[in-house]
Design a protein with these regions (language model features):
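Hydrophobic alpha-helical transmembrane segments
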Residues: 1-179, 187-319
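Glycine-rich phosphate/dinucleotide-binding loop and adjoining beta-alpha-beta core of small-molecule
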Residues: 184
Length: 319
């Protein structure tokens, strides 16, 4: 029951405070661990395709074991000392694992810059949350990129970690966070990460397979509650949920596009190179600045529904 209470507290603290930059974040430590482990395995394994594939697998095991074991041991000691101490520590961990408020806040920085109408400012703001080249994007392309980011990251930044937290408390939440961070840092198709990042990328796909689809359905339900076009959301999800190189990324993005009645995705430049991508959704209307706060409201509603569902599952597991 303590895990469930910690999740509830962590969720609401996240909504209240987000991720203050003045507080050290565990993902930064996980990132440093990944960098150190990468250097180690690159020295230990041969620089061949097979050698780097194996190195990536060993790296993945090292990082998830350490990232899971450390919080588990800390929580064990805290709960042994006093249940209240354990609850406080686990609540803080749950808060830091979730990213609901920060995802919305970062998108709203883009919205505020767009409202000011200064291209340099809104391009800079969106560059903080997307990986594509932003120097030549116009205002509507920036708006589209911000909406896509909220929609896509609703799953791996909020709903998926919440599911892992509900099932196994903070240690399992950190297990997921470590795996997801490895994919973000190493899961590229270009060298020097193409081979060593293969296992981290594939494991992230596996771990997100069910959460991404749950997130899509929960987002669809949230959109219906908000009065959005749930019928079109369902239609676009059924049609476009595979319109991405990743098996999971288009799940929530397609739902969001359908609910809003806009077209997302399409070709984009990365490091000066054009990447051809299929569109997601139909342009029933032109995308507009207000779609960014709409996506934020959809994110919050989806997160709230997820908390209710996953909290109920956790409650039944401990009954």
């Amino acid at each position: 029951m303590y895990h469930l209470i910690a999740l509830l507290i962590g969720f609401f603290v996240d909504l209240l405070l987000g991720d203050p930059h003045s507080i050290p974040h565990p993902v930064v430590w996980i990132g440093k661990l990944i960098s150190a482990a990468e250097k180690l395995v690159r020295r230990l394994f041969p620089k061949t395709v097979r050698g780097e594939n194996i190195a990536g697998g060993v790296l993945w095991v090292i990082v998830v074991l350490v990232s899971t074991a450390v919080p588990a041991l800390l929580l064990y000691a805290a709960y042994r000392f006093h249940p209240a101490a354990g609850l406080v520590l686990e609540s803080i961990m749950c808060w830091q694992i979730l990213a609901t408020r920060s995802l919305r806040d970062e998108s709203m920085k883009v919205y505020a810059a767009l409202k000011k109408g200064v291209p340099e400012e809104y391009r800079c703001a969106v560059s903080m949350i997307v990986g594509r080249d932003t120097a030549e994007l116009d205002d509507l392309a920036v708006t589209r990129a911000a909406v896509e980011t909220v929609a896509e990251n609703a799953s791996d930044g909020v709903i998926a970690p919440m599911l892992f937290l509900a099932l196994g408390g903070a240690p399992l939440g950190f297990f997921y966070k470590a795996a997801n961070t490895m994919d973000s840092m190493l899961g590229y198709i270009e060298m020097p990460y193409k081979n060593i990042g293969l296992v981290p990328a594939k494991m992230d796909d596996v771990l997100n397979y069910i959460p991404a689809r749950l997130s899509a359905l929960l987002m669809l339900a949230a959109g219906a509650l908000l009065g959005m076009d749930a019928k079109n959301g369902w239609r676009i999800w059924r049609r476009d949920r595979r319109n991405h190189a990743s098996p999971n990324s288009a799940q929530t993005e397609s739902v969001c596009a359908g609910l809003l009645g806009v077209r997302l995705a399409g070709d984009a430049y990365y490091h000066g190179e054009l990447h051809k991508k299929p569109y997601i959704g139909d342009a029933l209307r032109e995308i507009e600045y207000e779609d960014i706060p709409r996506a934020g409201r959809l994110l919050y509603a989806t997160a709230a529904l997820s908390l209710v569902l996953f909290g109920a599952v956790r409650f039944l597991l401990v009954m």
